[in-house]
A protein has these predicted regions:
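Bacterial N-terminal signal peptides that target proteins for export
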Residues: 1-9
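C-terminal motif of bacterial Sec signal peptides marking the signal peptidase cleavage site
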Residues: 17-19
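N-terminal "domain-start" segment that seeds a small globular fold
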Residues: 23-53
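Short loop/turn microsegments at loop-to-beta-strand junctions
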Residues: 38-39, 60-61, 139-141
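Short active-site neighborhood of thiol/selenol oxidoreductases, capturing the structured segment around
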Residues: 51-74
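Structural microenvironment flanking redox-active thiols in thiol-disulfide oxidoreductases
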Residues: 74-114, 124-131
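Thiol/disulfide oxidoreductase modules built on the thioredoxin-like
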Residues: 112-117, 123-171
Length: 177
């Protein structure tokens, strides 16, 4: 076989192998998947209000996992505020920040620094985060939950295309009355 033909076949085989691997959706550090019921939770926000998976049934909502030390979270939160919360809150969307195991003072500082107005809750010991993710998973995540309490969309990090897809998913869920 000529060297050019062998090289072409090698490149083709490698391309096919890489294509197959990338066509499978990785878990990206999640224990849960789209279609699964959201784990049961009871959270308290910085204003002392209680939020629960049971109490939110019948609503479309987002659980936004965050932490004060997370740079990507700090970048994403103003986008959630402007492009999601302001746009959909009057349509019935609930957006809950879920801070990973930090004291209220640190969380309040994060809220003040990022300017968000949606409720941000404490997750003592990272209990809910541990139900949703594998051990040592990164923090920046959003889980969109449908009216039946099932996970409808998951994000990881702040990727513009994925963020736009999440907005579309929220819009669709809110339209489905």
């Amino acid at each position: 076989m000529r060297p050019a033909a062998a090289l072409s076949l090698s490149v083709l085989a490698l391309s096919m192998l890489c294509g197959c691997a990338s066509s499978q959706e990785p878990d990206r550090g999640y224990r849960v998947a789209v279609g699964d019921p959201v784990p049961e939770f009871n959270l308290t926000d910085l204003d002392g209000r209680t939020w629960s998976s049971e109490g939110l049934k019948g609503s479309v909502y987002i659980l936004q996992f965050t932490a004060s030390w997370c740079g990507v979270c700090r970048k994403e939160m103003p986008h959630l505020e402007e492009r999601v919360w302001h746009r959909f809150k009057d349509d019935g969307l609930q957006l809950l920040g879920v801070d990973l195991d930090e004291p209220a003072a640190k969380i309040q500082s994060l809220v003040d620094d990022t300017g968000v107005t949606y409720p941000v809750c404490l997750d003592p010991g990272g209990a809910l985060f541990a139900e949703v993710t594998v051990p040592k998973a990164g923090v920046t995540r959003n889980g969109v939950v449908d009216r039946e309490g099932n996970i409808a969309f998951l994000t990881r990090l702040f990727d513009e295309a994925e963020f736009e897809a999440m907005i579309t998913a929220v819009d669709t869920l809110l339209e489905d009355q």
